[in-house]
Curated annotation (Swiss-Prot):
This is GTPase Der. Belongs to the TRAFAC class TrmE-Era-EngA-EngB-Septin-like GTPase superfamily. EngA (Der) GTPase family. Associates with the 50S ribosomal subunit. It comes from Psychrobacter sp. (strain PRwf-1). Residues 438-473 are annotated as: Disordered.
């Protein structure tokens, strides 16, 4: 199983990188994640071209010094550095209207040192001389791809060549086990936990390399059950674990989360809960994945410190009250085995099945115990419910005026379904559909207005009788 290739768009500000990003992803909304506050202004999007999928990074821009001079370190922003090292392929975007300036030359020099494929794009060629892009030959990066990204011109030529060596999308075979993604910040103990889980309990383990992103899919067996462990940090051999050099990659984490059945989020007890931990949990929540939280490095903490962390958990994890939290020591193996029952419970909850009759009965019981509020002088009516999907489970409720149902009542219904089905470790989505009258807005076929209390069919017969009588002499 392989990860998608990663393409980074780099260049000075305002050369059109974001426009190319939107052209590649075919929408201005196709962000995998908005990483504000975590990785500054990088944006990640999914793209597919000629049945080949890849991830695009819009790096936001490499700054320009006031005097137009300076080393590449003066120009390069931190997020661009990270994106360049995450990427498999680099697209260097320059402004054909502005021509080549010092910053372009400095970036070009740096790109020569990376040993990665580089595609040079001369954007904004509309209205400039045909020979204008030629000056960028001096960068030594080959012939520029002329482009007017704002109108989509030239993008196909770039994508033809850029995706030429990418593998076509294929339906991957099931690995034959429950897929677990281990996620977390650097140095929280992900690799130690991975090796502990594989440790003495390993029966048959072999590494299945991903791409240059270093994510590895490792099948293993425990107590007769099969698993596939997705290690976003890369598995180190026993005795060679050095988490000080473990690198965090948003790309690897996001793709592992999407590919997993259950996410195990690792948090460092010694450092406490930080915003980046909440970002990672948010990614899993947005992806609808079942989840278990492991508070690592619990051994050795004072009782006062442990109590502080428990209070902090109650305060900051209130958006995922259904997630099971375990206090472990990956290094010593303390309570690591307790993760497995919670993993299986979370997965079973995410895949539960139930009949429409049973769901509707639970809905009726919930409504009888706590009726919906009035809206516009009328009681909101909820008719029936059915299951709309799995992982995460989706319950669809049909009724009238469902758009007026308060958020508090929606949460009430979600909690009722959770309680009845004992759903633990998985998000639950409750969607509401409006029952529509197929005859609403249509004119009646009768030539006369309906008399009060008279059905349309009876009125029609009366009208016909009246018409026949009117022709008699």
């Amino acid at each position: 199983m392989s990860m998608k290739p990663v393409v980074a768009l780099i260049g000075r500000p305002n050369v059109g990188k974001s426009t190319i990003f939107n052209q590649m992803t075919k929408t201005r909304q196709a962000l995998v994640a908005d990483l504000s506050g975590l990785t500054r202004d990088r944006q990640y999007g999914d793209a597919t071209y000629n049945n080949k999928s890849f991830v695009v990074i819009d790096t936001g821009g490499i700054g320009e010094a006031d005097d137009g001079r300076g080393s590449i370190d003066d120009y390069m922003s931190a997020q661009s550095h990270t994106a360049i090292h995450e990427a498999d392929i680099l697209v260097f975007v320059v402004d054909a209207r502005a021509g080549m300036i010092g910053a372009d030359a400095e970036i070009g020099k740096m790109l020569h040192t990376l040993g990665k494929p580089v595609y040079l794009v001369a954007n904004k060629i509309d209205g400039v001389h045909d020979a204008a892009p030629a000056e960028f030959y001096a960068l030594g990066l080959g012939e520029p791809y002329p482009m007017t990204a704002s109108h989509g011109r030239g993008i196909a030529n770039l994508l033809d060549d850029l995706t030429a060596d990418m593998p076509e999308d294929v339906e991957e075979e099931d690995q034959g086990g429950l897929k677990l993604a281990i996620i977390g910040r650097p140095n929280v103990g992900k690799s130690t936990l991975v090796n502990r889980m594989l440790g003495e309990e390993r029966v048959v383990v072999y590494d299945m390399p991903g791409t240059t992103r270093d994510s590895i899919y490792i099948p293993f067996e425990r107590n007769g059950k099969n698993y596939v462990l997705i290690d976003t940090a890369g598995v180190r051999r026993r005795g060679r674990i050095d988490e000080k050099v473990e690198k965090f990659s948003v790309i690897k984490a996001l793709q592992a989360i999407k590919d997993a059945n259950v996410v195990v989020a690792v948090i460092d007890a010694q450092e406490g809960i930080v915003d980046q931990d909440l970002h990672m949990l948010g990614y899993a929540l947005d992806a609808g994945r079942a989840m278990v939280v492991a508070i690592n490095k619990w051994d050795g903490l004072s009782e006062d410190k442990k109590e502080m962390i428990r209070i902090e958990l109650d305060r900051r994890f209130n958006f995922i009250p259904y997630v099971k939290v375990h206090f472990i020591s990956a290094l010593h193996g303390t309570n690591v085995g307790n993760l497995y029952p919670s993993i299986h419970k979370a997965y079973a909850s995410s895949m539960f099945k139930v009949s429409t009759n049973r769901l509707t009965q639970i809905l009726e019981d919930a409504v009888a115990a706590n009726p919906p509020p009035m809206s516009g002088g009328r009681r909101i009516k909820l008719r029936y419910a059915h299951l709309g999907g799995h992982n995460p489970p989706i319950i669809v409720i049909h009724g009238n005026q469902t758009g007026s149902l308060p958020k508090s009542y929606q949460r009430y219904l979600e909690n009722e379904f959770r309680k009845v089905f004992n759903l633990e470790g998985t998000p639950l989505k409750v969607e509401f559909k409006l029952n529509t009258n197929p005859y609403a807005g249509k004119k009646t076929t009768s030539s006369k207005k309906l008399r009060p209390g008279v059905s349309e069919a009876r009125q029609k017969r009366r009208n016909m009788k009246y018409k026949k009588g009117s022709h008699k002499k």
